[in-house]
Design a protein with these regions (language model features):
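Gly/Ser/Thr-rich helix-start
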Residues: 9, 32, 158
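Aromatic/His-enriched, Gly/Pro-containing loop or helix-boundary segments
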Residues: 10-14, 51
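A post-motif C-terminal structural segment
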Residues: 1, 40-248
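PP2C/PPM-type serine/threonine phosphatase catalytic domain
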Residues: 7-8, 34, 91-94
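N-terminal carbohydrate-binding/catalytic regions of secreted carbohydrate-active enzymes
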Residues: 1-10
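Mobile, glycine-rich extracellular loop/lid and propeptide segments
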Residues: 13-17, 21-24, 29-41, 63
Length: 248
């Protein structure tokens, strides 16, 4: 337990080892894939230790030190447009990374691989992202599979949450479908490599607003008794427990 907005620290702001760091110590390969900036709260929670989630430049610097084997996401500006003037891309190259800031180029087997492909987050599905999430996931799985060492990877379908906050039904649904496609890639891998554990969960729900569905379902409401006019649900993260599904 810790406080709101903390990343990788206890309630008294002391660093606490993450699951990624623990598995690194045991010889695991590690990977992180996100649609947001790679310094955003969810990916950062696997490697960073800061007192506030918005400390993006410090989080980026810590990512360099952790040396994750494969990571992909956005957030260029936190690496090469920093207030301290540091060029973290140069530091990645000095640590023998294959770095690409333009596209998901083929990973280099003998190196760690970093893909930072947007100044902010990667575009949403309805903004023309394409198959970035499933392709990055497939690339990472192929990369890890070339070595004998086990691996740990976190893949985040980030914008399902964002669509809910924005009350944008089209965005939310398209992101769920894209995450489902990515999940299919992982399930195929698990089927071919049965000694693999897949865990699918969420860190929270995101309550939406059924008014966001009016354009798609003009005569229906997701909330019984509301009618087609719709109305707001909670605009925050509900405190309910989330499901955990596993395979393998």
């Amino acid at each position: 337990k810790t406080y709101k907005r903390a990343i990788g620290v206890s309630s008294d702001s002391l660093p606490r080892e993450t699951i990624l760091e623990q598995l690194q110590e045991q010889g695991y390969q590690t990977g992180l894939i996100s649609l947001t900036t790679i310094t955003h709260a969810t990916p950062a929670s696997f490697y960073a230790h800061v007192t506030d989630r918005d400390m993006h430049e410090e989080i980026a610097a810590q990512l360099i030190d952790v040396e994750v084997d494969f990571f992909a996401g956005g957030g260029k500006k936190f690496f090469n447009q920093r207030e301290d003037g540091k060029d973290l891309f140069a530091e990645l190259l000095s640590k023998n990374y294959h770095l690409d800031t333009l596209e998901l180029s083929k990973p280099e087997t003998g190196k760690k691989n970093a893909y930072v492909l947007a100044d902010e987050g990667i575009p949403s599905k309805i903004e023309g992202r394409g198959d970035y999430l499933s392709e990055a996931t497939k690339m990472a799985l192929d990369y890890f599979n070339q070595k004998e060492a086990p691996f740990f990877m976190m893949v985040e379908g980030s914008y399902i949450d964002w669509g809910g906050h924005a009350k944008d039904a089209e965005m939310m649904i398209s992101e769920v479908l894209d995450f489902d496609k990515t999940l299919g890639v992982v399930l195929d891998y698990v089927k071919a490599n049965p000694n693999t554990l897949l865990v699918v969960t969420a860190d929270h729900e995101t309550a939406a607003d059924d008014r966001g569905l009016r354009a798609l379902l003009p005569n229906r409401s997701l909330f019984p008794g509301r009618g087609p006019e719709g109305g707001p649900a909670a605009r925050v993260h509900p405190g309910r427990s989330r499901d955990v599904v596993r395979r393998g």
